[in-house]
A protein has these predicted regions:
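Iron-sulfur-associated redox domains of electron-transfer enzymes in respiratory
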Residues: 2-107, 141, 151, 155, ...
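Ferredoxin-type iron-sulfur electron-transfer modules in oxidoreductases and energy-metabolism complexes
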Residues: 30-42, 89-250
């Protein structure tokens, strides 16, 4: 059933802005991104929003809806009371470019800090072999669509801008975990590197990153906590230390 929704949408740029009120038609089955597009068509032709696939697979349309990080294309209007006012704002952790579009280059800088997969030197392409159970261990992490909702909601950088230089964020700590689990990766001590160089110690496992993940990846339980455990083992367990000396990979 169609109805008129009340929206408050943040309008502005890097120099500042404010929430602007709108009333817009909503049809059955629509998502928030549909309503933003209708606003562009009928009332705010210059409203800036980043989007691409409209299928929850590209991660482009990340924003905050009523203060909670979400994908605009995966948030159905039917989840809201028709009488409530829906507030849509840009991702708070990243600098605003214009309206709902933010500069997420922080994440690409952090991606470059993570050493890439390092295969054994004596193996040629086409010679890599893995057990299926090893493939499945990190399969969950490869579902990431890099929407950066986890990066945005993590209070380590959301509430503390000064931590950005030292903290890679849950998405890229998860990447370290994925590679550390890979049986053919020969890069030494990724878990220790995550602790010493990527700010793993800043994470206090509040699970806020897991809660906002649209792919339902258990980032905290399956990536961050195991990475913390391996970092502690490799730095402080004398048996593990001796084993690493005797049986160093690569």
């Amino acid at each position: 059933m169609a109805y008129q929704a009340k929206l408050r949408v943040w309008r502005g740029d890097e120099d500042g802005g404010a929430l602007q009120d709108f009333s817009v038609d909503v049809n059955e089955g629509e998502v928030v991104l549909d309503i933003i597009h209708r606003l562009q068509q009928t009332q705010a032709g210059d409203l800036a929003v980043r989007w691409n696939c409209k299928a929850g697979k590209c991660g482009s349309c990340s924003a905050e809806i009523n203060g909670r990080p979400k994908l605009l294309c995966m948030t159905r209007m039917s989840t809201f009371d028709p009488a409530e006012t829906i507030t849509i704002t840009p991702l708070r952790t990243f600098p605003v470019i214009r309206d709902l579009v933010t500069d997420v280059s922080f994440n690409y800088e952090k991606a470059r800090e993570i050493p890439s997969f390092t295969p054994p030197k004596d193996l040629q392409p086409g010679e890599y072999r893995m057990m299926q159970e090893d493939v499945e261990r990190s399969q969950e992490f490869r579902k990431c669509i890099e929407c950066f909702l986890c990066q945005n909601t993590c209070h380590v950088v959301r509430d503390h801008e000064e931590n950005k230089k030292a903290f890679a964020g849950p998405r890229y700590l998860m990447r370290q975990t994925e590679l550390d689990m890979h049986p053919l990766d020969t890069h030494d001590h990724r878990a220790v590197q995550a602790q010493d160089e990527n700010g793993l110690g800043f994470c206090n496992i509040t699970k806020c990153c897991t809660e906002v993940c649209p792919e339902h990846i258990k980032i905290t339980d399956n990536a961050l906590i195991p990475l913390k455990e391996r970092a502690a083992d490799r730095k402080y367990d004398p048996v593990v230390w001796l084993g690493n000396k005797l049986f160093r990979r690569g």
